[in-house]
Amino acid sequence: MVWIRESFKERLTKMRVHITSIYGQSPRSIALISQKLVKDVGRQLGYDEMGIYFYNDHAETHGERSTRMDGIIAGLGRGDIVVFQVPTWNSTEFDELFLDKLQAYGARIITFVHDIVPLMFESNFYLLDRVIDMYNRSDVVILPTKAMHDYLIEKGMTTSKVLYQEVWDHPVNIDLPRPEYQKVLSFAGDIQRFPFVNDWKENIPLIYYGDGSRLNSEANIHALGWKDDVELMLSLSKRGGFGLCWSEDREELVERRYSRMNASYKLSTFLAAGLPIIANHDISSRDFIKQHGLGFTVETLEEAVEKN
């Protein structure tokens, strides 16, 4: 029995945990920022990083793509654990081949789902079966919410070991001023994804963190431009008011429908800055907001203004 225990301890010592993280996107990319956040936590726990570059992999042959991945997983040992953050925002073929490579090494795979592209964009919905197949090949899947899990089960997901993230953490390493109550709403996001910003005519000003060059000049908006995390936290806490988590569906982007299933990084950003929340009444975190007294959920933007 002694040699069995020693052999098992030796296997545990040799086993390593790896975590993927994407590179090559804009520093403003929430996809890049959120993967880096998870990766940094993993590094603190002793995980080894596998960097994955974001690029046009359609220009590569299968062999070239395979060679690239061999370099990414060069430090992988048989039986190691890999936390695979998805999507990589490369092609579905890329993610599938990467999973093939991991399984060929006998890796145990924890797939950490940040977003599901086929559920975000109507034109990509046809890829959902392939994405679910990748989840089914994983040993463990971390999903944003139970609502998303329920939906995926209806579409064929069978993985038995599933964890729910529910809410993003947002570590802050600086001292922030205590926000004061102000009759303002703050919002951050791309105007192409959230066009309601351009139609803002309410009597309460909207403080907008994003590209203000395309804003309607008649809108009641104070555009402050894009800010990095530290600047954003300081600005939000200094100006006070409420953080607005709002989305609406349109032809190609089903933002509102998707918000019922995903975990909003924006919500956690506002909370980390000390701002209460005003959000769509059907946002996935509505119960979390209500149970902890973190703000209000409303059905219309007019109601959001009234709550302020």
Regions from the language model: what does each represent?
Residues 1-56:
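N-terminal subdomain of nucleotide-sugar transferases
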Residues 139-153, 157-174:
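Donor nucleotide-sugar binding/catalytic pocket of nucleotide-sugar-dependent glycosyltransferases
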